[in-house]
Regions:
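Short beta-strands within extracellular/lumenal beta-sheet-rich domains
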Residues: 106-129, 151, 179
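Glycan-recognition and processing domains
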Residues: 43-117
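Short beta-strand-to-coil "C-cap" segments at the C-terminal boundary of structured domains/repeats
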Residues: 22-27, 182-189
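A short beta-strand element within beta-rich, extracytoplasmic domains
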Residues: 130-143
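Extracellular beta-strand elements of beta-rich domains used
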Residues: 1-3, 183
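Ser/Thr/Gly/Pro-rich low-complexity, disordered linker/stalk segments of secreted
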Residues: 4-51
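Short beta-strand-plus-loop segments that form exposed binding edges in beta-rich domains
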Residues: 164-178
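Short, surface-exposed beta-strand/strand-loop-strand elements in extracellular ectodomains
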Residues: 140-158
Length: 189
């Protein structure tokens, strides 16, 4: 059977296809039970990731001091509606790059939500002018849904760089979009 990646996040087989191997086992050997990841009880999850209402906070445990900060409102940059967003610059020279990370749906700016929609497995790569202690993002809420990204998202800090991935590992769907409106970088000093 041919495996097709439908809509960038749903693996399917072609119609009439037959599955001939499960977990590396074939014809009667039995594939056993695949490992299933545990689901978090609360939306606040992952090391360095906290979700509270429409606020997503990314914290660097290795940064113990607090310095200056810079804030960016994505709605004030003159970005084109429904257009892909790549790199935007903060007033102090720090940047955030919105990366599709190989996914069919990449980050786009929408005027009606006043921010950038970040889809499943997309990345945000922050490059600070100094070591980053924390990143605070305010996000959109619509019809009772807080668009704060997936609870399984990851954050990785490395000196002046931080990489957020809106990780989604389920076989169907795309999880929760991150609809980021403002971003505040707090530096360590």
């Amino acid at each position: 059977a041919k495996l097709i990646n439908y809509m960038g996040n749903t693996p399917e087989t072609n119609q009439g296809g037959k599955l001939i191997s499960v977990n590396g086992k074939t014809n009667g050997e039995g594939g056993g039970t695949p490992d299933t990841p545990s689901k978090p009880d609360t939306p606040a999850t992952g090391e360095g990731l906290t979700i509270d209402g429409t606020t997503v906070t990314l914290s660097n445990a290795a940064a113990t001091t607090t310095g200056t900060s810079v804030e960016l409102n994505l709605n004030t940059l003159g970005l084109a509606n429904q257009a892909a967003v790549e790199t935007v610059k903060f007033s102090d020279g720090s940047t955030v790059t919105f990366d599709a990370n190989g996914q069919e749906n990449g980050p786009k700016f929408y005027t009606n939500t006043k921010g950038v929609r970040v889809y499943a497995n997309n990345k945000l790569i922050f490059k600070g002018i100094k070591k980053i202690k924390q990143i605070v993002m305010t996000c959109d809420s619509y019809n009772g849904i807080n668009y704060v990204g997936n609870a399984t998202a990851t954050i990785e800090f490395s000196d002046k760089t931080a990489t957020y991935t809106n990780l989604y590992t389920e076989s169907t769907g795309g999880g929760v979009q991150l609809r980021v409106k403002t971003i505040k970088i707090i530096y360590a000093e």
